[in-house]
Amino acid sequence: TLNYESNPYMNENWFQRACLVGDASTSGISCVITNEAINEILDISGIDDVNTVYSGSFPSQMVAGLNEGVGFFNYRGYYGVSGFGSSDVNSTSNGYMLPVATVITCGTGSFGSSSGESLIESFIRAGTPSNPKGSVVCIGTATLGTHTMFNNLVDMGFYYGALIEGIETPGAALMYGKMMLY
């Protein structure tokens, strides 16, 4: 993170790209609709190179999306993240092109689990200082049994807060997303 902030990788326009993933198979079409709304927010903000993934082999497309280099990576779906897991994060090769990742679905942020590190831990711990991968920040949920409609609102609110309202830190943008519940 220190190198990311003090010496950011500025080649290409990777930070002007995004990958949005929505799996409607279990949680319903609202996961796709949420990503379409986020896509509109990105477009308003000048980010129009957006890879959308709504079907097919989710894990391989998600790894490819991260490897391409994106400023934002978003997943909306269900518990299990459509088969995408820690090993997929560790197989990425995005180098210093580290996105802000949002994986706001059941159990992605369950730190201290007996089953190993959570997905968001994998995102921020992947790689090494000389060979980074994963993401610079990752936001998820800490428990099982969350609800799609609430997760969708928090997700859209995060992006609205960060990109439309100009909220500069991920924590504050997440709080903005949570405030959308009220």
Stretch-by-stretch model annotation:
Residues 1-182:
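Cysteine-dependent hydrolase recognition
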